[in-house]
């Protein structure tokens, strides 16, 4: 990593003891900062707190007392999940204390080129594709995944060498806290309305996403989804070289034409060879192809890698086949748009959808067009009655109810026939029955595994 002196003897407050906060605290301590870590949980609820104390890092737990700011911190490194409306954070802004996120630290110490990926949907899948592509055809160095994908960016940046590529998934929450962060390649998969409770308005949300390119120059490349007019308009305001991708037209970049994927008129592969279904995954693949071509990955390696890629866990992930029924886990679909995208990749006449979850107060009328023609729908959770109303509007004849995901799998399997597909894509958050979407997805996969074992 780069040896920087920026933080020597500087008083820094790290807010939040999640993985990224612990990583940031340790890095700042190593760089000579006087670090205090603050977390809302009690000390005994933070497994890393004792380790930080042992290093000589001060730890304050059990709340975010505003009085902490009286200690005249020169910088705050904020966990992305802590909103700017938090009283301590709001007061820090009033006092004009600089606030950054951990990805800014990673960018400051990284020796290697950075590939940054953001967007409303498809970030994790695209980031994973890019990592696999860059590692498939390299002469030196390694593509190292980091950021919102689950690996603290500041830890990975310390480990990466100058020959590597730091491939970072970046959320809008993380991008709100960057100042000098400078990717050499940046990808925006798409922008839809999301996280307005955090950002306050769509304008602020878009601004956070667009911040990924604010330090880029004409020597850098910004890869944009040309299907979206909004991104075409924003493209006129960046200093970076713009490389588009599109499923609607041939562009000077990556595109879909007559069922085939191209890059600048160069044939890459048939779209139907992609290992994961859905029009949204064609977009993700095109974005990844752009990065791969910039990094000189061969067409043969691109085709082989994307054909073999079976998806990221809980994101239209192929789980297996039981008695000629195919099962897909899309538990990450925690909103209507994500489920619409998942459904676009399947033949509804042979599809049984498993959906439902936390009731956030919205109706599901906008999901109706995507539900048309479904063979059956199995509903669970707080929203099952609302989803049933949407299913009726879509003229779905078979509407079934289940207690939870596990029983939904059994009910769907019993109703299905050979060559059918059973898809978990809930269109809702999981918190009414499961602690997170991962646990919900694991429950689905375990139920499928039990079906497999029962036929042995």
Swiss-Prot record:
Catalysed reactions listed for this entry: UDP-N-acetyl-alpha-D-muramoyl-L-alanine + D-glutamate + ATP = UDP-N-acetyl-alpha-D-muramoyl-L-alanyl-D-glutamate + ADP + phosphate + H(+)
Keyword Ligase set for record: yes
Enzyme type, top EC level: ligase
Pathway listed: Cell wall biogenesis; peptidoglycan biosynthesis
Family, as annotated: Belongs to the MurCDEF family.
Name of the gene encoding the protein in the UniProt record: murD
Pfam families: Mur_ligase_C (PF02875), Mur_ligase_M (PF08245), MurD-like_N (PF21799)
One cellular-component annotation, GO: cytoplasm
Lineage: Bacteria, Bacillati, Bacillota, Bacilli, Lactobacillales
GO annotation terms (biological process): cell division; cell wall organization; peptidoglycan biosynthetic process; regulation of cell shape
Keywords: ATP-binding, Cell cycle, Cell division, Cell shape, Cell wall biogenesis/degradation, Cytoplasm, Ligase, Nucleotide-binding, Peptidoglycan synthesis
Protein name: UDP-N-acetylmuramoylalanine--D-glutamate ligase
């Amino acid at each position: 990593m780069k040896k920087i002196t920026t933080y020597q003897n500087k008083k820094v407050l790290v807010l939040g003891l999640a993985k990224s906060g612990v990583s940031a605290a340790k890095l700042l301590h190593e760089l000579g900062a006087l670090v205090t870590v603050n977390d809302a949980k009690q000390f005994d609820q933070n497994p890393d707190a004792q380790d930080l104390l042992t290093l000589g890092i001060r730890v304050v737990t059990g709340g975010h007392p505003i009085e902490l700011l009286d200690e005249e911190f020169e910088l705050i490194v904020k966990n992305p999940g802590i909103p700017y409306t938090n009283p301590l954070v709001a007061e820090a802004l009033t006092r004009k204390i600089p606030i950054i996120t951990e990805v800014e630290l990673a960018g400051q110490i990284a020796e290697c080129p950075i590939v940054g990926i953001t967007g409303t949907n498809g970030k994790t899948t695209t980031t994973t594709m890019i990592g696999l592509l860059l590692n498939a055809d390299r002469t030196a160095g390694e593509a190292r995944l980091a950021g919102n994908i689950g690996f603290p960016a500041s830890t990975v940046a310390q480990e990466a060498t100058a020959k590597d590529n730091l491939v970072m998934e970046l959320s809008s929450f993380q991008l709100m806290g960057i100042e000098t962060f400078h990717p050499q390649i940046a990808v925006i998969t798409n922008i839809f309305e999301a996280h307005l409770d955090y950002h306050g308005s769509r304008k602020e949300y878009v601004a956070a996403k667009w911040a990924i390119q604010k330090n880029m120059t004409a020597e850098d490349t910004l890869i944009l989804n040309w299907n979206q007019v909004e991104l075409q308009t924003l493209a006129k305001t960046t200093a970076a070289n713009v490389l588009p991708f599109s499923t609607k037209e041939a562009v000077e970049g990556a595109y879909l034409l007559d069922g085939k994927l191209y890059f600048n008129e160069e044939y890459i592969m048939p779209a139907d060879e992609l290992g994961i279904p859905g029009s949204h995954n064609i977009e993700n693949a095109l974005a990844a192809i752009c990065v791969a071509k910039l990094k000189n990955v061969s067409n043969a390696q691109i085709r082989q890698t994307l054909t073999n890629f079976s998806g990221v866990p809980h994101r239209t992930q192929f789980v297996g086949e039981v008695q000629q029924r195919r099962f897909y886990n899309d538990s990450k679909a925690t909103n209507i748009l994500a489920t619409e995208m998942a459904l676009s990749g399947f033949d509804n006449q042979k599809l049984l959808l498993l959906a439902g979850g936390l009731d956030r107060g919205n109706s599901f009328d906008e999901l109706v067009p995507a539900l048309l023609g479904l063979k059956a729908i199995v509903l669970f959770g707080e929203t099952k009655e609302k989803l049933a109303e949407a299913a009726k509007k879509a003229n779905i004849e078979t509407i079934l109810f289940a207690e939870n995901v596990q029983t939904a799998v059994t009910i769907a399997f019993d109703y299905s026939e050979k060559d059918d597909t059973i898809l978990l894509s809930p269109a809702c958050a999981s918190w009414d029955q499961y602690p997170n979407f991962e646990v919900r997805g694991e429950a689905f996969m375990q139920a499928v595994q039990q079906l497999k074992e029962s036929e042995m």
